[in-house]
Amino acid sequence: MLSAVIVAVLGAWGAWQRRWMSDDGLIVLRTVRNLLAGNGPVFNAGERVEANTSVLWQYLIYLGALLTPARLETIALWLALSFTTAALAIAAFATSRLYRTPGLVFLPVGGLIYISLPPARDFATSGLEWGLCLLWIAVLWALLIRWVGMRGTAKAGRSTYWLAFWAGLSWLVRPELALYGGLVGLVVLIAADNWKKRGWVFAAAVPLPLAYQIFRMGYYGLLVPQTAVAKSASDAAWGSGWDYVTDLFGPYTLWVGLLLAAVSAGLAL
C-alpha cells in the first residue's frame, strides 16, 4: 500500500510541474461549451460532427461543468490529474496483491519508469483523455486480478460481471482500447462454464457501448468518431509505428531501465 501511495504522489507532483492545456484539449472544451449551450455534442452549432475521440472524456468534463462553476480548463486539468494519480495507485496496489509473498518487498518499477518519462508527465494533464485511459487500464487490471482470485468462490459471479461491464466501456474511453477490452471479454466468455453465464456477460458488457453506437450512427452518420476518418485510422502505418518506438526508447535510453527491471524481477522471483 505504501509503495502505491508513493508512486502516485510522485506522479501527481511531476504532472503538476508540467501542467498545461493543448490545442486538441481546447477542441474538447469547445464541444463541452456547445453541450452547455444546448447545441448538442458538436464542434460547430448546426454541424453534426463528432470532433472528439473519447466519448466519456467530454461528458465527464460536461458533468463537472454542471456541478461546479469552475472554468472548463480547470475542470479538465483536475480530472486528468486525478485520474492519472488514481491509475498509478490502483495499478501498483493491484500488482502488489498479485505478488503477495512473505519477505518480498514490492517496488512499483513500472510506475516509476513511466512517470520518469517527460511525455508521461506532460500528458497527465493537457486537457486530453490520457489520464482517463490510464485509469481505465488500471481498473481493468485490478478487476482482472480480482476475477482470477475469486473464481470458484461465492463472489465469482459479481466479479465477472463487473469485469465485463468495465471491459465494455473501452469503446467509449477510446475506440482502440476495445482491443484490450475485447480480449478480456473473450477470456471471460471462454472461462464461463455455460451459455447462461455467457449471456449475462454480454448483458453486462454490451448495452452501454451499443446504445451509444446506435446514437453515433443516427446522430453523426458514422460508425467511428470523425477523428478516425480525418486521420485515416483504418490504414496500417508500421513504419510510423516503428518511428514512435525508436523515438520513445532512444532519447530516454528506456531499454536500460526495462532491462534492469526485468533482471531485478527475475532475481526476486
Positions of the model-derived regions?
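Membrane-proximal envelope and lipid/glycan-remodeling enzymes
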Residues: M1-L269
